[in-house]
Swiss-Prot record:
InterPro entries for this protein: 7tm6_olfct_rcpt (IPR004117)
UniProt keyword RNA-binding, yes or no: no
Function: Odorant receptor which mediates acceptance or avoidance behavior, depending on its substrates. The odorant receptor repertoire encodes a large collection of odor stimuli that vary widely in identity, intensity, and duration. May form a complex with Orco to form odorant-sensing units, providing sensitive and prolonged odorant signaling and calcium permeability. Involved in the behavioral responses to pentyl acetate and pyrazines.
Name of the encoding gene: Or33b
Organism: Drosophila melanogaster (Fruit fly)
UniProt protein name: Odorant receptor 33b
Main subcellular location: membrane
Record's subunit section: Interacts with Orco. Complexes exist early in the endomembrane system in olfactory sensory neurons (OSNs), coupling these complexes to the conserved ciliary trafficking pathway.
Single GO molecular function: olfactory receptor activity
Length: 379
């Protein structure tokens, strides 16, 4: 007989996420961590995209500009999103506290099995996929420099000295670019894994709430008092979920708008680079992996954003599926008001304009294709 208590722990999903912040020097009071945070802020978050942008202005051909534009846009928006999330860490922690409270409400074997076999597994797959995609993108970029031939920097960039003066200066500059882009990727892992991972957990908790709602009044020994208590507890769970949604709207309002712009630009320019400016196999591999990374960066967030809306819409049916017909008028009145609350459409928007869902994903892909056709016409 299995005597192990059935519990779910949403915070376990976020262990790797908080590790990213620790590696970047945040969420710690140690002096060395604060010093590391200062160094990364100056030389990576601020200076790294600036030196890439200045390098673009120094390029003389359209091909070189197109080659440098994807990573420049990616690093700029990585810093932009990282700053946005950094100022929202208190809200992110508040969301995690609400998740812990909702975890305590999942007591049945059915709820625990669903969360652990579906929600938790999918959320873990999300952050692992980002690590693989971004890691491969970084490795292919480094390989394109080390084995691609020539004496070129990792990316077109401006330095306040002659990079080609000596071998030592050149390789120090390349080392800075490799270290900088690796830390920028670490920042992007924190930026991009959080939205889809959290959306997945929210959708999972909405499904658990639907399970509890549909079971209200179905037990053979449930009294009117116990049934009413279960309804009030479910209403409180719904309130917490809506609070999480409001916090997510605040947290992702600006950062996800930057995400959509960055993805649209990068997908289109990367396609142009693959077709016209990739001059060796390493470059083709790099741009191909980079293109897949850009798609992966956007798709999970939009998919689980839509899933939240779908699961929220199912709550009304779950309430109706409960045993409400044998209850008194007071209970039915509360139930009816609760049903009306669940009819409201739930959607998280980027910039207060773009709903984070599959419609936005396909719109971004269409925008990228429009940029691509424009570039083809200007060729």
């Amino acid at each position: 007989m299995d005597l192990k208590p059935r519990v779910i722990r949403s915070e376990d999903i976020y262990r790797t996420y908080w590790l990213y912040w620790h590696l970047l020097g945040l969420e710690s009071n140690f002096f060395l961590n604060r010093l590391l945070d200062l160094v990364i802020t100056i030389f990576v978050t601020i200076w790294y995209p600036i030196h890439l942008i200045l390098g673009l202005f120094m390029e003389r051909s359209l091909g070189d500009v197109c080659k440098g534009l994807p990573i420049t846009a990616a690093c700029f928006f990585a810093s932009f999103k990282f700053i946005c999330f950094r100022f929202k860490l208190s809200e992110i922690k508040e969301i995690e506290i609400l998740f812990k409270e909702l975890d305590q409400r999942a007591l049945s074997r059915e709820e625990c099995e669903f969360f652990n076999q579906n929600t938790r597994r999918e959320a873990n797959f999300i952050w692992k996929s980002f690590i693989v995609a971004y890691g491969l993108s970084n490795i292919s970029a480094i390989a394109s420099v080390l084995f691609g031939g020539g004496h070129k920097l990792l990316y077109p960039a401006w330095f306040p000295y002659d990079v080609q003066a000596t071998e030592l200066i050149f390789w120090l500059s390349v080392t800075y670019q490799i270290a900088g882009v690796s830390l920028a990727i670490l920042q992007n892992l924190a930026n991009d894994s959080y939205p889809p991972m959290t959306f997945c957990v929210v959708a999972g908790h909405v499904r658990l709430l639907a399970m509890r709602l549909s079971r209200i009044g179905q037990g053979p020994e449930e009294t009117i008092y116990l049934t009413g208590k279960q309804l009030i507890e479910s209403i409180e769970d719904h309130r917490k979920l809506m609070k999480i949604v409001e916090l997510l709207r605040s947290t992702m309002n600006i950062s996800q708008l930057g995400q959509f712009i960055s993805s649209g630009v990068n997908i289109s320019i990367t396609l142009v680079n693959i077709l016209f400016f990739a001059d060796n196999n390493f470059a083709i591999t790099y741009y191909g992996v980079y293109f897949l990374s850009m798609v992966l960066e956007l798709f999970p967030c939009c998919y689980y954003g839509t899933l939240i809306s779908v699961e929220m819409n199912q709550l009304t049916y779950a309430i109706y599926s409960s045993n409400w017909m044998s209850m008194n008028r007071s209970y039915s009145r509360i139930l009816l008001i609760f049903m009306q609350l669940t009819l409201a459409e739930v959607q998280i928007k980027a910039g207060g304009m773009i709903g984070i869902g599959m419609n936005a994903f396909f719109a971004t892909v269409r925008l990228a294709y429009s940029f691509f056709t424009l570039a083809m016409s200007l060729r």
